[in-house]
Amino acid sequence: MIDRSEAVAPAASQDAVAPGSVPASSRLDRVIWALTGLTRRHWLLGLLLAAGLVLRLLAQVGYEPALLYIDSMKYLFGTHLGTQFNQSDLGSYDPIGYSLLVLHPVLIFENLSFVAVLQHLGGLAMTVALYALMVRRGLTRWLAALAVAPVLLDSYQLNAEQTIMPDVLFEVLLVAGIVLLLWPPRPALALVILGGLAFGASAPVRQVGEALIVPGLIYVVAAARGWRTRLLHGAVMTFCFALPIVGYMTYSAVTLHYGFELSNMGDAYLYGRTAHAADCATLKIPAIERPLCPDPAVAATLGVDGTVNSIDSPRSTYHPVDVQAGQLINTMPLQVQLAYSVLRQQPMRVVGDIARDSVKIFALTRNGEEGDTPISRWPFQTSYPYYPYYRSATAHYGRNSASRVFAATGGGGKARVFRPAAILLRDYQLHGGYTPGPVYLAGLLAGIAGIFTWRRRRDSGLALASVLITGSAFAVLLGADLYEFTWRYQLPALVTLPIAGAFGATAVARYIRARRSGVPAAVPAGHAHADGVEELAVAVSEQAS
């Protein structure tokens, strides 16, 4: 006969645990409960993330291995001297930090589709980071979720993530700098260093990132306490911001032989903006410069981009000859002289031209105006898009065909489209799948209002956050509009203006509440936790151990 107590003893010994330890089943239960609680608390973000993920999967399977834009070639081949595509000179037009930071490392895996996947993950990561920042700083969960919805659902953002272009990397660096600097109410020196490096690294990706030093420096100085800390943080921010820029310029001079610069297109776009704005009939300039000043009808048709890049622009068709030397005259110095003449004699025309471009982002619909870079370049197409009329772009056939580009850069197969997914994405984009301009305007106005809630002797965390985010939006959007307006350059609005609006609206609401009650109503910034995130982290770490 078997003793029942002896029969159950082995089972009991198997379930025994060391004193002070937690059973594995209990740890797993804690993880499950933490995940369940997290989902319940952040259900709106979860729904938006699910929708954003579906849209990104459609884009990934709809256009393989990735989309190519007119300027994609210079990033793919800008540092490959002597390629069969003969585009090595294009790397000097714009900084190619995107090639160095993303394309070259990822193409080790010999498939451009991995670049698109990485950029889609970047879009999702920006959403989660911004949402976590807002919840941490005490904003309501529903407001934080609505503020990040444009990043997840905007079809132009989806198109950018699927395209071999630097826009998404620029957004990621911009968001990284904002999140690092705002994570605590007053950033420690380590976060100032990291935030400055993130902002500075954005400039070799898109040169307009140079403007981020202004809001970044203002914020770290204003957020610090004591003049010594302000001086230290300001100096460190400036140094760390400059480090990636100087490093890239050195690389450009020593390795690429383009010169100690980020780009060589500054003078060209200065000419384009001023020539487009000029009243040539009343402008007092030398006769040799006169042909470079376009007629009003020509300027309106070409726009700023066409004035710089079109083969029909005055800078392309005008070829003055030095009779004595018997050679053509380089017109670039003449273009610069014309630009400065316009700035001196007609500054308000230039200001007005920039102002008209800067408000286009607030339009209800996505309609291009005469002279604007065609918005038709950025909607999803039902077949693979080609740009055969541009020297540096891809064509359907020939040596610059998209399929040959993919083969030359490491693989991914031929350019192909899954039409059902492409049709769905195009219909979504053309029927309201984008962020309307009034949303941006509301975010901007709320962000500005939040700045004016700053109070010296009370909690000013949200007001200072509004300074950084709204200032960053001003820097990158207006900085781009100084040279030209294109809808592609408005993408950073998605990761700044709605967020600025959420911070600003919360700051205003708390300010009004405090004025009515006579007591500060602010939640101590940085003490609000992410509603279950910490509990989940603890549970996961215990499960792993």
Which residues does each PLM region occupy?
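Membrane-interface transmembrane helices that cradle and orient dolichyl/undecaprenyl
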Residues: 177-192, 220-224
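Transmembrane-helix signature of polytopic, membrane-embedded enzymes
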Residues: 130-153, 171-172, 186-193, 467
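Extracytoplasmic catalytic/substrate-binding loops of multi-pass membrane glycan-assembly enzymes
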Residues: 62-76, 88-101, 109-110, 261-262
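Multi-pass, polyprenyl lipid-linked donor-dependent membrane glycosyltransferases
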Residues: 70, 93, 115-122, 149-181, ...
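Transmembrane alpha-helices of multi-pass, membrane-embedded glycan-processing enzymes
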Residues: 98, 102-109, 115-129, 170-173, ...
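Membrane-interface anchor segments at the N-terminal boundary of transmembrane helices
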Residues: 40-43, 113-114, 353-469
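Transmembrane signal-anchor helices characteristic of membrane glycosylation enzymes that use polyprenol
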Residues: 40-67, 153, 241-252
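Juxtamembrane membrane-water interface segments immediately following transmembrane helices
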Residues: 67-69, 74, 234-334, 341, ...
